[in-house]
């Protein structure tokens, strides 16, 4: 971890995980599906394969079974049936993800696991004016890559590659969950889920990524 908050959060999550593991899940524990040591599990994130190992990251709230601050849990498998929980490598330890490391995706390539995710921030609302749909929320797209090769348990300094101000003006604050892939031409592509400000169906925002550190928005980005 790159800062004191991250280091303290890592210790706290590890302590909760250790205590829960010691207690065990009993007769109701999952035997086939991924199950974290404690708390609440939601969206699978960053599913990828590297060196014969499958990686499944997931939304994990270790402190509350009804949800709460979201981290990324991490489990690995060689057969997609037996999973080992190996920790929580991505924690909300920066101003741009302080209310949760939300969903995203990963690619295993060039000796690294590369991740894009949504950093969730709910702004303080002393006056009660935010509805947290059109106002009061940030959802920046954040990039990290593993610093321990393809193990994917330790990650680099976080970097915002798309700030909330970069999204189209007709979208609400609900823009999240980047899915990235690489085309045959070598270009990276990314899709984000989004909600328009006017009533209507949810849409996708499509971004063309020239590289992980510089994303460009084409004119016909919305479908």
PLM region spans:
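N-terminal regions that are enriched for targeting/export leaders
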Residues: 2-54, 60
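Hydrophobic core segments of beta-strands in well-ordered, beta-rich domains
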Residues: 43-64, 85-87, 102-134, 141-145, ...
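Short coil-to-beta strand junction motifs in C2/discoidin
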Residues: 69-70, 137-138
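Blade-loop segments of beta-propeller domains
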Residues: 71-74, 80-109
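Non-cytosolic beta-sandwich-type ligand-binding/adhesion modules
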Residues: 71-77, 146, 209-212
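Short loop/turn segments immediately following beta-strands, especially the blade-tip
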Residues: 146-153, 215
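Conserved small/polar residues in nucleotide/adenosyl-binding loops
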Residues: 213-219
């Amino acid at each position: 971890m790159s800062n004191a908050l991250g280091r303290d959060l890592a210790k706290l999550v590890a302590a909760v995980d250790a205590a829960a593991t010691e207690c065990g899940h009993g007769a109701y524990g999952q035997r086939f599906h991924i199950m974290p040591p404690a708390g609440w599990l939601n969206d699978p994130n960053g599913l990828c394969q590297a060196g014969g190992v499958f990686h499944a990251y997931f939304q994990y709230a270790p402190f509350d079974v009804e949800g709460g601050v979201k981290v990324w849990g991490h489990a690995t498998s060689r057969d997609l049936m037996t999973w080992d929980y190996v920790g929580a490598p991505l924690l909300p330890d920066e101003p741009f993800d302080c209310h949760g490391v939300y969903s995203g995706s990963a690619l295993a390539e060039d000796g690294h696991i590369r991740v894009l995710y949504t950093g969730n921030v709910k702004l303080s609302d002393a006056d009660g004016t935010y509805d947290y749909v059109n106002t009061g929320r940030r959802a920046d797209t954040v990039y990290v890559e593993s610093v321990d090769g393809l193990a994917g348990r330790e990650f680099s300094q976080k970097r915002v590659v798309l700030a909330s101000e970069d999204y189209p003006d007709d979208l609400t604050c609900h823009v999240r969950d980047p899915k990235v892939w690489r085309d045959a031409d070598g270009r990276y592509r990314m899709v984000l889920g989004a909600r328009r400000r006017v009533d209507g169906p949810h849409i996708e925002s499509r971004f063309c990524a020239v590289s992980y550190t510089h994303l460009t928005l084409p004119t016909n980005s919305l479908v």
